Amino acid sequence: MTKRANIGGAAALLGLALAAAAPAGAQQPSDGKTVFDKWCAPCHGDGPGRPGTAALQALYKGAKPALLEKRTDLPPELTKQFVRTGVSVMPFFRKTEISDAELDALAKYLAPK
């Protein structure tokens, strides 16, 4: 066997070993909080400069929480619809941005407990 074949075989074995050693959750979809923090919080998070939160605060005038994470009336189907189709000035998000699995996790995270 040549030196080149030995190196190629060793590299293949190393790749298999690394794949087998990957954490169990490595291929699992993100949890809903992680998805929210990445895609939603820039507009719908707490604090100044959050246009989504400001718009909901103006709309609800205290009748409902402006912070999505504090709402108790967001069924998963509604969250999924808003994310995929957008609403008012909120853009829609493609499956290449938020996968179906991530959207499921997000909708579950924001759903009434």
Model feature map: region roles:
Residues A10-A19:
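Bacterial N-terminal signal peptides
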Residues K33-K64, Q81, V89, P112-K113:
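Periplasmic/extracellular electron-transfer cofactor-ligation site
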